[in-house]
Amino acid sequence: MEMCNFAVESADTVFMEVIYEDNHIVVVNKAPGEIVQGDKTGDEPLVETLRRWIKEKYNKPGNVFCGVVHRLDRPVGGLVVFAKTSKALSRLNEMFRNGEVHKTYWALSRNLPELPEGELKGYIRTIEKTNKSLYYASPREGAKEARLRYKVLGSLDRYHLIEVELLTGRKHQIRVQLASVGCPIKGDLKYGDKRSNPDGSISLIARHIEFVHPVSKQRISLDAPVPDDPLWKAAESLKQ
């Protein structure tokens, strides 16, 4: 097992921070604004940057395998797992489907939920044309069940740090479910916050991931550093 934490410069991405790497997987701290897979913008996705990095680092001829296991929304930062082998990709996909990967997110909101911790249950339907998810308290045609657990970790003068554990994986789930209880994420104009963040991000990060390695069977437990921002640094101190 090789633990690493360093930045990789490329022509199209300011940096790529590798948190963990071995022969089968790579875990990257995605910066807000980056895309994991290609989209209609034509911007280079993180998977391609990583593929080029692997090719150059190990002087690999020909095509390099790099499989996308899961994604984060463009304005969200934090941990993303990639597979370096087809065996790892197949097993990780199965683990994600079976709920065997534990992911924890941190969010900043101007508002507090009614209870300091709890579980949110509802239904989400995604409108692809507008790239937005709609939330319903009861079942609706075309909507899928969405569940998460949350806990308020602490409060600053104007913002509150909320820890979220996803129990299902729906598009924009954390964003829409926190907004449904009056707690839109800081900077998330799409789901009800009133002011954007200067860098276009929203104040949501994939903070922690834990799973059994798909090949070695060792337990992997990783944390993403919080963004280099005074508000996030202050929020992080609430947990210490």
What is each residue range found by the language model?
Residues 1-240:
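RNA pseudouridine synthases
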